[in-house]
Amino acid sequence: MDIAIVGNGPAGWSCAMTARMRGLSTVVIAPAGVGGWLSGAERIDNYPGLPQVSGKELLERFRQQALALGAEEKSALVRQIMPNGERFLLLAENDVLEAKAVVLCMGAARPVLLPGEEELLGSGVSYCATCDGMFYRGKRVAVLSASASGVEEAAFLRSLAESVDYYALKPHDVSSLPEGVQAVAEKPRSLAREQGKVALNTDRETHLYDGVFIFRTAVPLRMLLDGLETDGGAIRVDRSMRASLPGVFAAGDVTGGPLQIAKAVGEGNVAAIAAAEYIAKLG
């Protein structure tokens, strides 16, 4: 794959269109149903040429146009991006994708971390069951999930771990949890290291686990890609939408305000052009 676009808002689809017009293989990756605040907007009046259109309809028009040009789409949350020579590996739930360039278009939403989560990441806390599940074979683990996608992750971990407890970070259907996975009706508050294990403190008590897996619909920028420079919670870019790492670009609300559809579309276009130029130099 030439370009992997993370995010399916206006910036992402705009980037995909321009990339395909440049003849580059392109995939747009985002969790199913995610379209940011725009998907819930009842009426948009300030997008040129399309007055009084709903946000959902506008997004679908962007999507259909990009797909018609040959862009691919994948429903998954990208949990981590790692440089791999002149390529990038994107860990996307139960899959690993490779691309020559990455364009980040995830919007402005940022997850709120549990106290202690960042400190324990990679040391008992993980965002990827496929990547790290093997380290917890025969051990006790917990799954903390903000959506029903965590049910599938819990099922995978159950095939490895001795026991799996499931905590819903936000209300969602847990009726399809497999046998052997216990739903715990407690609210996680914080994480800490205790007795050589991960202590999960809830609104009721403290539970000790060998590992804790956390699944949300977004990943903190500083944990998504090591070395990515930010400014006030936004990705720092230059006028060509180049981020601080070679081969990485960003567009849309993720680069900061003003949070406008037209800005996102324009930045997506610029990012695709810059990414195409970067790939051409790779030879």
Descriptions of predicted regions:
Residues 66-85, 89-91, 97-99, 159-239, ...:
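A Rossmann-like FAD-binding core segment of flavoenzymes
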Residues 73-138:
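Glycine/small-residue-rich loop that forms an oxyanion/phosphate-binding "nest" at active or ligand-binding sites
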Residues 9-10, 33, 148-149, 255:
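Residue-level detector of alpha-helix initiation sites
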Residues 2-27:
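N-terminal Rossmann-like FAD-binding beta1-loop-alpha1 element of flavoenzymes
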Residues 32-55:
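Conserved N-terminal glycine-rich FAD pyrophosphate-binding loop of Rossmann-like flavoproteins
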Residues 21-39, 167-173:
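Glycine-rich FAD pyrophosphate-binding loop
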